[in-house]
Amino acid sequence: MQIPFLHKRKRGKKPSAAAAAARAVDKARYDGTLIARGLTKSYRSRRVVNGVSLVVRRGEAVGLLGPNGAGKTTCFYMITGLVPVDEGSIEINGNDVTTMPMYRRARLGVGYLPQEASIFRGLTVEDNIRAVLEVHDENVDRRESKLNDLLGEFSITHLRKSPAIALSGGERRRLEIARALATDPTFMLLDEPFAGVDPISVADIQALVRHLTSRGIGVLITDHNVRETLGLIDRAYIIHAGEVLTHGRANDIVTNPDVRRLYLGDNFSL
């Protein structure tokens, strides 16, 4: 799949009204999309990501997969804002966020859930969510209403007064996602959500991701647990040697001979 590139504006000349209108139309065209174009990253003389392009749309779950050392994690971290981009661009809803820090990307609709526990351990469940709401909404009544809605939506109302440190793994993940949704993100970036969890928690996380997409949120997942991820996503990009080897739906990925030879192995099945 080819990703269309936006035309770059020449410097020096003030844009005409027609040109400004054309750019507004072009920006609207990309509303509801997260687009990475030609991402490239080198460390010293080694190029670890070489021209990776991908698209995530609202309401779909997309996997970013590949063998160890393929460059998928570096690519994912460039999209989150944790790693600077050497070449290429990243756009959220038509806004160029390539050089923006994480907090500015968050304001434009990007939520990020790291692999490590990110709860505020010294706070209760409700205060974990309230702390985020206080930053994003000055209206107390509206904050409390949204807090109650999120607690109910993720079935943790009965835990609202519990210390966050006492939660189980599945409860903690529900709290983390509920807290991330307090900012009303358009996209969620999930880093290794299936790492080190038991089978019951795997099913719980899969249900949570499906819930996010049903909300109209686009989800980008990177994970080493291939079977669990492929069983959940709408599409996947397979990264090998720093480049996109192929992309498509799960069945297309699994039956691709290059993917089986270089990544999944001959005996892999969903």
UniProtKB/Swiss-Prot annotation:
Establish whether keyword Translocase is in the entry.
Answer: no
Family annotation (Gene3D superfamilies): P-loop containing nucleotide triphosphate hydrolases
* UniProt KW ATP-binding keyword: yes
Naturally occurring in which organism (per UniProt): Rhizobium meliloti (strain 1021)
Q: Pfam families, per this entry?
A: ABC_tran
Per UniProt, ATP binds at: 66-73
Source organism, top-level taxon: Bacteria
Keyword set, alphabetical order: ATP-binding, Nucleotide-binding, Transport
GO CC terms on record? ATP-binding cassette (ABC) transporter complex
Q: Which family does it belong to?
A: Belongs to the ABC transporter superfamily.
Q: Which SMART domains match?
A: AAA
Q: What's one GO BP annotation on this UniProt entry?
A: transmembrane transport
This entry's Gene Ontology molecular function terms read:
ATP binding; ATP hydrolysis activity
Protein name, per record:
Uncharacterized ABC transporter ATP-binding protein R00382
List each copy of the ABC transporter domain by range: 34-266
PANTHER family, per database record: CONSERVED COMPONENT OF ABC TRANSPORTER FOR NATURAL AMINO ACIDS-RELATED, LIPOPOLYSACCHARIDE EXPORT SYSTEM ATP-BINDING PROTEIN LPTB
